[in-house]
Curated annotation (Swiss-Prot):
Leader peptide range in chain numbering: none
Result of altering residue 227 to Y: Light chain no longer cleaves SNAP25, not toxic in vitro or in vivo when reconstituted with heavy chain
Highest taxon, organism lineage: Bacteria
Organism, as annotated: Clostridium botulinum
Identification of the protein by name: Botulinum neurotoxin type A
Region called N-terminus of receptor binding domain (N-RBD), residue ranges: 871-1092
Cofactors named for this entry: Zn(2+)
């Protein structure tokens, strides 16, 4: 069903219903205008907006410049009936295009449902419409009626391309941000759109981005509709809350104030400019405003000015605000419902998300100050369709977004070149002491009268330099921790899957009816929306500098197109002072070739050689092994843009190696993270439960603190670093285009010197030349993008994250002391729990929380680069064993030869997992290239691998050290060996002096983190310092090795159990790496994090969790109990029963029994999963095994209370009961493998995580939404954390 009621024509006669002359609220009397009601609550007025504000009634250009990148004025636009008809059809077509997507249908339904609150009465027990949320509709007989509405689309005012969402009403700013909302007016035109450079973002396809692209006008209208949604629901951010820029330097934009509302509406990583502390402030503010509205509805006893009933209007606002209603009719705000509505309005509805649904190209940031504007006509289907936009299917316009490419689809786009009233703000950058004879003209920004060379730089081409005032820093505030301290739920990233979940649960029914309203005054007088005062900055401000800038270098590459000959030069001075010279950063050989005149007979060969050389110059890259996280360097960026202000441009590669990515930044960001605020722990005398809960809450709040700091750093990085990198990206594209233009001009000049007869013998096409040069530029931009992205991520990871981690580690140390003292002070209350709680505190606070960029941004380009950053650590590996293409191979650049014995076993699920037995034929030999055989006294090196060591079962293993990895020759080298409860690293020099570093673990422990479980081992060796062993990213032991002499290792590495007395012994090993450097702690943690494969769920041992495999269950909150079934059927329940009991062999091991209780089997919900591996967010069923028969885990979601008791049901009896579980992998990177199971109802709504709740001292399994509110990353304390235990030979327990 279409969104627009019917097809309208502007000349259709008025009927007083959906075609009528109307009066809208304004600041004075107005003449009625013809309007069209395209849907309930939504009208379109195909007129220029000269009536909402009399001060804006003049359509001519203003006398002074506006502080915007570009303005366009044409007083004749939209003055004829044909133009108005085309406008009407264009707007309705865009509404249908938006409505055709799932996201658009949700947004438009929200807008129709978003009736402004009836708060127009001065009596608090009375509901009354606010008159400025109404229009007067003129009837055919001349009378009028008043009608409430939500949205009006109006033509633009004087500036045709200034699209905006505005409103009128009493104290209008409060209405749009106090929860009430007010009627919205959008100034918009479907006949104009904006350009952007997509090649700045393209990473892989040189065919994409061959020119300028045009924005789909549906995206532009959707952006304004999102604003309307915020304002109708009264959650718009105060326009005074803006993102400011500094203005004190020549390279910074002046006067730019981007409102938080715009950043939030755009979405993507721009929304991350608003730091989390401020976003939490907004959310809490509007939550309280919604509670005020619920309170007002509860007080209301009557309604006036309408024939609608009070109860009907209450129900309208109940639907709008998703209020809860109890049996007495009292309304309240449910926090979960509010959070869902607020998330939908502010994070689901964004421009960035609409781009994904429209499947179009779009600007990548709101801070896109491209000045290209195009005239378009979207009404004909041959130009634009509802489903495809410009990229028409079954045509050449469908591929590579060619329909939006303004050069390929040039018939659809008319670029506005001669702007009426094109105002630009600029700065004048002058370098002192330059002799200016024969300089370029003053019109180009050069001062001929002074001994200063001045260039004019547009304000919007300068660096975006955010002010420190933008970043809230309340991290130093202390906090009181109690037993009921609120733990914030971890935020869920916005994904297409999440949006689809919102769509599936969205209620599209119950669209509000038209309500009869008593006639208001014939002229509804509104109050103008006051806009914030933007500080104005002087235009043309002059800055006197003593050196050239990036902008001088770019200007030196420009020239005036004409009939005169130009020539390239490698001298910036010469190019700036001589109008016929153009600066190039290409080689002197290229300069000689391009400047050399050629005869006609040689012309085509000359051109072909120049194109080849141009491609060769732009393709230049350098590589270095000195920087692990930057794999390629574009050496000409320095001389192209004067990076480093001339100091480093002649050796840009050397400067980057010496200084790092910081040399790219014009201004170095400062991150002011104070000493983090401490926690004040509240004591509870003689109350064990509340005391333990307080400790748990402190640890969870600690995790929140890490999250806050990481978010704060990412916000600073995006705003302060990434924006600078993006400007360099843009300027490099301009620089390459300048070189192409100069090359073309020289070639074209030479061609025009020939006689007509000579030209006739030359088959030369300037357009073909342009295409070839543009293709070279776009290929070059792929490398430039990769390099700049790597630099940006490198700066984040090496200069910003470590600073935050140091602050957090200091905080952890302080909290650890406070918690241990708290436990000691309350030891009398915590009888039987003291040691367990001390261990929990020590373990939790001695482990850093790894940084994961994907938690904080969803920009795929940056996330891809972050992943590459992690992989680049592997690139320093000189041996990297992986199983690929049915072979075990060395992925390092050395490709070492590998020999595999006949008794080596590769796990069938993950073939990187290699099993070695205590057999002569169970071995792997790696033959190293001579270049990497270790033979040194000083060179550092490291190794890392994962290992799973089965339990030692008998006394034959005591005091039996045996080698598993050996690189010794002539009693010199290194090896890894095992002993009962030990992993041992040995270094030995040629004089047989040795050093050992050991990790020890115990087998006399209830539940071990190490026995038969995958362990990540890293050993680093600094030859002038220590050898260190890390387990799961944590430093365990270190010993000095500076006393060792030359170590000459073997040229092969043998993986084999050598010297083991137990003939049944075996080990598992995977991901072996050898590095020719000492890995630092951050690199070890990054490597650990990457190799943990957090997107795949793991079982108790660390293997991949699988479908259709039986598992015993371990609850991490109460690990001494197991799951049992009271009875099957809907009246039965499952519960935790204990204790587990023990398995033991005297003096060898003493452990809890793991194979106890009811087994769970994970079953596929859909057939899309092909490899039988359970992944994060998989939707599954859980079967439970009772007396060798499988039953389905399910619940009745209509049970009273938050906790829904789970039952084991016959599978055919499940029916409509809730049984779908979403599997969650906790990305804690710890030595345990926590899983969480989120049960959902049949509509996809969360019922809650599966845990347990005490009912009459019985710990029954439940699905509880309490967990969803309380859960926090890395928590080991909540009852919804589980581990799946399969039977495994390495544990040695007989299953019951």
């Amino acid at each position: 069903m279409p969104f627009v009621n019917k097809q309208f024509n502007y000349k259709d006669p008025v009927n007083g219903v959906d075609i009528a002359y109307i009066k809208i609220p304004n600041v004075g009397q107005m003449q009625p205008v013809k309007a069209f009601k395209i849907h309930n609550k939504i009208w379109v007025i195909p007129e220029r907006d000269t009536f909402t504000n009399p001060e804006e009634g003049d359509l001519n250009p203003p006398p002074e410049a506006k502080q915007v990148p570009v303005s366009y004025y044409d007083s004749t636009y939209l003055s004829t009936d044909n133009e108005k008809d085309n406008y009407l059809k264009g707007v309705t077509k865009l509404f249908e295009r938006i409505y055709s997507t799932d996201l658009g249908r949700m947004l438009l339904t929200s807008i129709v449902r978003g009736i402004p609150f009836w708060g127009g009465s001065t009596i608090d027990t009375e509901l009354k419409v606010i008159d400025t949320n109404c229009i007067n509709v003129i009837q055919p007989d001349g009378s009028y009626r008043s009608e409430e509405l939500n949205l009006v689309i109006i033509g633009p005012s004087a500036d045709i391309i200034q699209f905006e969402c505005k409103s009128f009403g009493h104290e209008v700013l409060n209405l749009t941000r106090n929860g009430y909302g007010s009627t919205q007016y959008i100034r918009f035109s479907p006949d104009f759109t904006f350009g952007f450079e997509e090649s700045l973002e393209v990473d892989t396809n040189p065919l994409l981005g061959a020119g300028k692209f045009a924005t789909d006008p549906a995206v532009t209208l959707a952006h304004e509709l999102i604003h309307a949604g915020h304002r109708l629901y009264g959650i718009a951010i105060n326009p005074n809350r803006v993102f400011k820029v500094n203005t004190n330097a020549y390279y910074e934009m002046s006067g730019l104030e981007v409102s938080f509302e715009e950043l939030r509406t755009f979405g993507g990583h721009d929304a991350k400019f608003i730091d989390s502390l401020q976003e939490n402030e907004f959310r809490l503010y509007y939550y309280n405003k919604f509670k005020d509205i619920a309170s007002t509805l509860n007080k209301a006893k009557s309604i006036v000015g309408t024939t609608a009933s009070l109860q009907y209007m209450k129900n309208v606002f109940k639907e709008k605000y998703l209020l809860s209603e109890d049996t007495s009719g009292k309304f309240s705000v449910d926090k979960l419902k509010f959070d869902k509505l607020y998330k939908m309005l502010t994070e689901i509805y964004t421009e960035d998300n609409f781009v994904k649904f429209f499947k179009v190209l779009n600007r990548k940031t709101y801070l896109n100050f491209d000045k290209a504007v195009f005239k378009i006509n979207i009404v004909p289907k041959v130009n634009y369709t509802i489903y495809d936009g410009f990229n028409l299917r079954n045509t050449n316009l469908a591929a590579n977004f060619n329909g939006q490419n303004t050069e390929i689809n040039n018939m659809n786009f008319t670029k506005l070149k001669n702007f009426t009233g094109l105002f630009e703000f600029y700065k004048l950058l002058c370098v002192r002491g330059i002799i200016t004879s024969k300089t370029k003209s003053l019109d180009k920004g050069y001062n001929k009268a002074l001994n200063d060379l001045c260039i004019k730089v547009n304000n919007w081409d300068l660096f975006f330099s955010p002010s420190e005032d933008n970043f809230t820093n309340d991290l130093n505030k202390g906090e009181e921790i109690t037993s009921d301290t609120n733990i914030e739920a971890a935020e869920e990233n916005i994904s297409l899957d999440l949006i689809q979940q919102y769509y599936l649960t969205f209620n599209f029914d119950n669209e509000p009816e038209n309500i009869s309203i008593e006639n208001l005054s014939s002229d509804i007088i509104g109050q103008l929306e006051l806009m914030p005062n933007i500080e104005r900055f002087p235009n043309g401000k002059k800055y006197e500098l003593d050196k050239y800038t990036m902008f001088h270098y770019l200007r030196a590459q420009e020239f005036e197109h004409g009939k005169s000959r130009i020539a390239l030069t490698n001298s910036v001075n010469e190019a700036l002072l001589n109008p016929s010279r153009v600066y190039t950063f290409f080689s002197s050989d290229y300069v000689k070739k391009v400047n050399k005149a050629t005869e006609a007979a040689m012309f085509l060969g000359w051109v072909e050689q120049l194109v080849y050389d141009f491609t060769d110059e732009t393709s230049e890259v350098s590589t270095t092994d000195k920087i692990a996280d930057i794999t390629i360097i574009i050496p000409y960026i320095g001389p192209a843009l004067n990076i480093g202000n001339m100091l480093y441009k002649d050796d840009f590669v050397g400067a980057l190696i010496f200084s790092g990515a910081v040399i790219l930044l014009e201004f170095i960001p400062e991150i002011a993270i104070p000493v983090l605020g401490t926690f004040a722990l509240v004591s509870y005398i003689a109350n064990k439960v509340l005391t333990v809960q307080t400790i748990d809450n402190a640890l969870s709040k600690r995790n929140e603190k890490w999250d806050e700091v990481y978010k704060y750093i990412v916000t600073n990085w995006l705003a302060k670093v990434n924006t600078q990198i993006d400007l360099i990206r843009k300027k490099m594209k301009e620089a390459l285009e300048n070189q192409a233009e100069a090359t073309k001009a020289i070639i074209n000049y030479q061609y025009n010197q020939y006689t007509e007869e000579e030209k006739n013998n030359i088959n030369f096409n300037i357009d073909d030349l342009s295409s070839k040069l543009n293709e070279s530029i776009n290929k070059a931009m792929i490398n430039i993008n990769k390099f700049l992205n790597q630099c940006s991520v490198s700066y984040l990871m090496n200069s910003m994250i470590p600073y935050g981690v140091k602050r957090l580690e200091d905080f952890d140390a302080s909290l650890k002391d406070a918690l241990l003292k708290y436990i000691y002070d309350n030891r009398g209350t915590l009888i039987g729990q003291v040691d367990r709680l001390k261990d929990k505190v020590n373990n939790t606070l001695s482990t850093d929380i790894p940084f994961q960029l994907s938690k904080y941004v969803d920009n795929q380009r940056l996330l891809s680069t972050f992943t590459e950053y992690i992989k680049n650590i592997i690139n320093t590996s000189i041996l990297n064993l992986r199983y690929e293409s049915n072979h075990l191979i060395d992925l390092s650049r050395y490709a070492s030869k590998i020999n595999i014995g006949s008794k080596v076993n590769f796990d069938p699920i993950d073939k990187n997992q290699i099993q070695l037995f205590n057999l002569e034929s169970s071995k792997i030999e790696v033959i190293l290239k001579n270049a990497i055989v270790y033979n040194s006294m000083y060179e550092n090196f490291s190794t890392s691998f994962w290992i799973r060591i089965p339990k030692y079962f008998n006394s034959i293993s005591l005091n039996n050290e045996y080698t598993i990895i050996n690189c010794m020759e002539n009693n010199s080298g290194w090896k890894v060996s095992l002993n009962y409860g030990e992993i041992i690293w040995t270094l030995q020099d040629t004089q047989e002096i040795k050093q050992r570093v050991v990790f020890k673990y115990s087998q006399m422990i209830n539940i071990s983190d190490y026995i038969n479980r995958w362990i990540f081992v890293t050993i680093t060796n600094n030859r002038l310092n220590n050898s260190k062993i890390y387990i799961n990213g944590r430093l365990i032991d270190q010993k000095p090795i500076s006393n060792l002499g030359n170590i000459h290792a073997s040229n092969n590495i043998m993986f084999k159990l050598d010297g083991c007395r137990d003939t049944h012994r075996y080990i598992w090993i995977k991901y072996f790496n050898l590095f020719d450097k000492e890995l630092n702690e951050k690199e070890i943690k990054d490597l650990y994090d990457n190799q943990s494969n957090s997107g795949i769920l793991k079982d108790f041992w660390g293997d991949y969790l699988q479908y259709d495999k039986p598992y015993y269950m371990l609850n991490l909150y109460d690990p001494n109990k197991y799951v049992d079934v009271n009875n099957v059927g809907i009246r039965g329940y499952m519960y935790l029963k204990g204790p587990r009991g023990s398995v033991m062999t005297t003096n060898i091991y003493l452990n809890s029994s793991l194979y106890r209780g009811t087994k769970f089997i994970i079953k596929k919900y859909a057939s899309g999963n092909k490899d039988n591996i359970v992944r994060n967010n998989d939707r599954v069923y859980i079967n439970v095994v009772v007396k060798n028969k499988e039953y389905r885990l399910a619940t009745n979601a209509s049970q009273a209370g938050v906790e829904k008791i789970l039952s084991a049901l016959e599978i055919p009896d499940v029916g409509n009961l809730s049984q779908v579980v979403v599997m969650k992998s906790k990305n804690d990177q710890g030595i345990t493998n926590k899983c969480k199971m989120n049960l959902q109802d049949n509509n996809g709504n969360d019922i809650g995580f599966i845990g347990f709740h005490q009912f009459n001292n019985i710990a029954k399994l439940v699905a509880s939404n309490w967990y969803n509110r309380q859960i926090e990353r890395s928590s080991r304390t909540l009852g919804c954390s589980w581990e799946f235990i399969p039977v495994d030979d390495g544990w040695g327990e007989r299953p019951l």
